[in-house]
A protein has these predicted regions:
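Positively charged n-region of N-terminal signal peptides that target proteins for export
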Residues: 1-5
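Accessory carbohydrate-recognition regions in carbohydrate-active enzymes
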Residues: 23-230
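Bacterial N-terminal signal peptides
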Residues: 7-16
Length: 230
């Protein structure tokens, strides 16, 4: 009996010692994730910031070329016409690209333009050598404007941060007409708050989703100095 008690006490001592060990540091497993897998060929994978099952997929939208651009991003193309808040990923058909936002410097236009003519619209090349693509975070410099665009997302919100060069002509263009592939806007509109820090708007469209209705609110860190409708 005495031997049994000794063994039992030793077992508890070993257990207590094990409990006293420091917890291992949590490993950052997302560092092994490559969100750009599937962005070439016929992969149709979206690149940008989102969370699982979120309503927002905020990221760059390129000048559309053909079926392989239906996610808004293709690894062979570095053009950007804006950062849209909804994208499909890995699908065989295109839609969405709702509420496209583009930071610019200089003359403002609503034309998206074509790559063959750099002055045909507001589009810019993205500096892919400095592009950062991580789970939940996206960043890229816009070569034409000297602007760095960063974004992240929650399940319902896309958050943008634009770093502009020193300029009196910095602006942010909201394009409610832009849509993915077969998507076409049927009704759009928005209103500004009295202090010019908030936009409330809507975009109705038809396409793969025949009666899609998107409502949004955008808040700025600084009041807009002026508002132009194009």
């Amino acid at each position: 009996m005495k031997l049994a008690n000794i063994v039992l006490c030793a077992g508890f001592a070993a257990l207590a010692g094990a409990c006293a060990q420091p917890a291992p540091e949590a490993e950052n497993l997302t560092r092994w994730v490559d969100p750009k897998i599937g962005t070439g060929g016929h992969g149709h994978v979206f690149v940008g910031a989102n969370v699982p099952f979120g309503l927002v997929q905020v990221g760059p939208t390129s000048i559309p070329q053909d079926w392989d651009w239906c996610s808004g991003y293709h690894e062979s193309d570095s053009t950007v016409i804006g950062f849209s808040h909804t994208h499909l990923s890995g699908t065989g058909i295109g839609d969405l690209f709702d509420v496209t936002v583009m930071p610019v410097v200089g003359e403002v236009t609503c034309a998206r333009g074509v790559e063959e003519d750099p002055q045909s619209g507001l589009w810019s090349y993205a500096d892919r050598s400095k592009e950062v693509v991580e789970p939940g975070y996206y960043s890229v410099p816009l070569s034409r404007y000297g602007i760095t665009a960063e974004m992240t997302a929650t399940s319902r919100v896309g958050l943008h941060r634009y770093t502009f060069p020193a300029s009196d002509d910095a602006a942010v263009v909201f394009d409610l007409e832009n849509g993915g592939c077969w998507d076409k806007a049927t009704e759009t509109g928005f209103t500004f708050s009295e202090d010019s820090t908030r936009i409330s708007g809507w975009r109705y469209s038809t396409g793969w989703a025949r009666d899609q209705k998107v409502y949004f609110v955008a808040e700025f860190s600084k009041p807009a100095k002026g508002i132009t409708y194009l």
